[in-house]
Structure formats: structure tokens, C-alpha cells
């Protein structure tokens, strides 16, 4: 694979591309990566590449030098990628997709960004590595290159490890252990010590499911959606029915019954619940049973609610926040917004127009 990186600071990439796995892949000819200076295509005697934007502070990369730099390295099979927080979030699936390209051009932003006309003219796709702003796009380019290189045959010593690593099946990886069997009183789980591969695989899958559900509910929701037509365990099936259709009844363990009853009654504009039961309106007629457990550890539940239009969607989110609930991230496709109640139970909120 050939990769060209367009940046104002091409030397920024020298050390990372000489080191470790990427460095070895380049030496072996599996990767051909060149970093190029956009200033070479600057305007006038002083090679100007930036200017003040209209009606805005800071400096912006000009369209002409950027377009010239891209066209200088572009060929018929090239894919031009701009690293931007506005782009599609980088995932294992996207990394694998990029690894199939024969020539990638990574455009790194600097200062306040790049003149929009250059992006409209030359860029095929924008990719983000997260919802935050970096000092330059070079860091993001290195992250994407490292992620996609794992899927190029020969780059890793054992290609099978790339397929089995964490995130490849949509779930987080479970814990790993090595010797000694006991460290500071903490023991390796017994199931790993007897060589029963079927039992170990089952244990790893369950730990992976539990860890993803607890730590990354957004990933867990997407995992359930993506596996809709695949065989799943009974536990996953029960949860998926809750996510996709709404089950007839679900138990929410709560710390303070009065607080949760008041919260959900106001959220769904219900009359006071009968016997701690809440009947959620809609096609599925879900019933929520509130069960007070005090300070004991709760069994966290994932639920789904699809609203009829965007106005209802944003009204629901605003009401949730106003009543003291927590708004969390959207899923990686921007289709689902996660919210948490006081006790940590997660709702995946979407609207029909977003699907």
C-alpha cells in the first residue's frame, strides 16, 4: 500500500514511521509512506499557505496550495482522506476498509482548518478519531495509519491476532493473565488453569459481553443491532428484544424508590404508578417494575425507545437532562443517543426520521 501524508510539518512523522511495527513494515516494502510539505505548493516568493478567514479569528489553510498538493500526488486509484472531528468516527470496520485501498492520501489540518472549497473539490472522506480537537491533524493521521496497517497481510507477525483482537467482534476484550497464579492475593480465574478450551471460550465470551455492557454501552447496543440475524445466546436474545422491540415487562433495580418513581413519572408524563409499576405508552406497551435495593450493587439494564419525530427526540433529551438524568454519547453512526438515569440504567433513544 502507498500512503502520502500532506502536512505543514512533514518531519513530524519521521520517528513514528521508523519505529516498531510500522518501521519494519516500511523496510520490508509492505508499506510505502511519504510525508510531504504543503508549503512546497505555497503562493508567491514566501510560499504562503495560510490567510485570515472571513469574519473569523485565527488563520486558515488556503484552498489553492492544498489543492495543488493533493493533485501533485493524486492518481486514478487514490482515496483522499481529511482528518477532522467532523468526520466519521474511526472504527475497526473502517480501518479494515481503508486497508483495502491501494493509495491513500491523508490531508492534515492545521490552525483553524482548511478552506472549505479545497475539501469540496478534492476530499473523498473525512475521518475523526474522537470528539476532541488536536493541535494538528498529524496525530490523527498516525492513529489511522497504525490502525489500518494491522489489516495489511504481513504487517503483523500473526495475522490471526488482528482478527481476534479486542473490538474486532464489536466487543471489548476480557482480562488477560500470566504467571504467577497468585499475585498479592489475587488469583487467576480457575477456569483458565485446566485446559478446557470450550469452557475457556465460553468464559471469555461472557466476560467480554459483561465488560462491554458495563463500560461501553454504546458499543454493546451496536453489537446487538449488528447481530440481529445471527445466532446469539439466550442472554443476548433477551436484551436484544428489549432493545429492538421493547419487552412486556422489565425490572429496574433502584436505590431510592420515591426518587425513581418521581423521575420516570415526569419523564413519561404518567400518573402515579400503581404498585411501583410504570406503563410506558407506545406500540409495545412496556411495563417497568421499580424495585428498591438501596445501596446494594444493581443489575444495570439497557432499554430502547424510538420516538416519532425529531421534535419529540430533542424534547425528550431536554426533559431527561432537566430532571437530573445524564446525557451520554451517540453511537458511532449518530443514530442513537444514550442517556442514564440516577441508578445507571441506560436508555438508547432514537427517532424514526434518523433511521
Swiss-Prot record:
S-adenosyl-L-methionine binds at residues 109, 129-134. Specifically methylates guanosine-37 in various tRNAs. This is tRNA (guanine-N(1)-)-methyltransferase. PANTHER family: TRNA (GUANINE-N(1)-)-METHYLTRANSFERASE (PTHR46417:SF1). GO terms for molecular function: tRNA (guanine(37)-N1)-methyltransferase activity. Its EC number is 2.1.1.228. NCBIfam families: PRK00026.1 (NF000648), trmD (TIGR00088). Belongs to the RNA methyltransferase TrmD family. It catalyses: guanosine(37) in tRNA + S-adenosyl-L-methionine = N(1)-methylguanosine(37) in tRNA + S-adenosyl-L-homocysteine + H(+). The gene is trmD.
Amino acid at each position: 500500500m502507498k500512503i502520502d501524508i500532506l502536512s505543514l510539518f512533514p518531519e513530524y512523522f519521521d520517528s513514528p514511521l521508523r519505529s516498531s511495527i510500522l518501521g519494519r513494515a516500511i523496510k520490508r516494502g509492505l508499506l510505502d509512506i511519504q510525508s510531504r510539505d504543503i508549503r512546497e505548493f505555497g503562493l508567491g516568493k514566501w510560499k504562503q499557505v495560510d490567510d485570515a478567514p472571513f469574519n473569523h479569528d485565527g488563520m486558515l489553510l488556503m484552498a489553492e496550495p492544498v489543492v495543488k498538493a493533493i493533485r501533485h500526488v493524486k492518481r486514478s486509484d487514490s482515496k483522499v482522506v481529511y482528518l477532522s472531528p467532523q468526520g466519521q468516527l474511526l472504527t475497526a470496520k473502517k480501518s479494515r476498509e481503508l486497508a483495502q485501498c491501494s493509495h491513500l492520501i491523508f490531508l492534515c489540518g492545521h490552525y483553524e482548518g482548511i478552506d472549505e472549497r479545497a475539501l469540496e473539490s478534492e476530499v473523498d472522506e473525512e475521518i475523526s478519531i474522537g470528539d476532541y480537537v488536536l493541535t494538528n491533524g498529524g496525530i490523527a493521521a498516525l492513529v489511522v495509519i497504525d490502525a489500518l496497517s494491522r489489516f495489511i497481510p504481513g504487517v503483523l507477525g500473526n495475522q490471526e491476532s488482528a482478527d481476534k483482537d479486542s473490538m474486532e467482534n464489536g466487543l471489548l476484550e476480557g482480562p488477560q493473565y500470566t504467571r504467577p497464579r497468585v499475585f498479592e492475593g489475587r488469583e487467576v480465574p480457575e477456569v483458565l488453569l485446566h485446559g478446557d478450551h470450550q469452557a475457556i471460550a465460553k468464559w471469555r465470551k461472557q466476560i467480554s459481553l459483561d465488560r462491554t455492557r458495563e463500560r461501553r454501552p454504546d458499543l454493546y447496543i451496536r453489537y446487538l443491532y449488528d447481530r440481529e440475524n445471527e445466532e446469539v445466546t439466550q442472554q443476548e436474545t433477551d436484551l436484544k428484544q428489549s432493545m429492538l422491540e421493547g419487552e412486556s415487562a422489565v425490572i429496574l433495580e433502584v436505590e431510592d424508590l420515591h426518587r425513581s418513581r418521581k423521575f420516570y413519572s415526569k419523564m413519561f408524563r404518567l400518573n402515579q404508578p400503581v404498585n411501583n409499576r410504570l406503563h410506558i405508552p407506545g406500540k409495545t406497551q412496556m411495563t417497568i417494575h421499580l424495585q428498591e435495593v438501596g445501596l446494594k450493587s444493581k443489575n444495570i439494564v439497557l432499554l430502547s425507545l424510538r420516538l416519532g419525530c425529531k421534535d419529540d427526540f430533542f424534547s425528550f433529551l431536554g426533559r431527561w437532562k432537566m430532571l437530573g438524568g445524564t446525557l451520554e454519547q451517540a453511537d458511532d453512526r449518530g443514530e442513537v443517543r444514550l442517556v442514564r438515569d440516577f441508578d445507571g440504567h441506560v436508555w438508547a433513544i432514537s427517532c424514526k426520521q434518523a433511521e
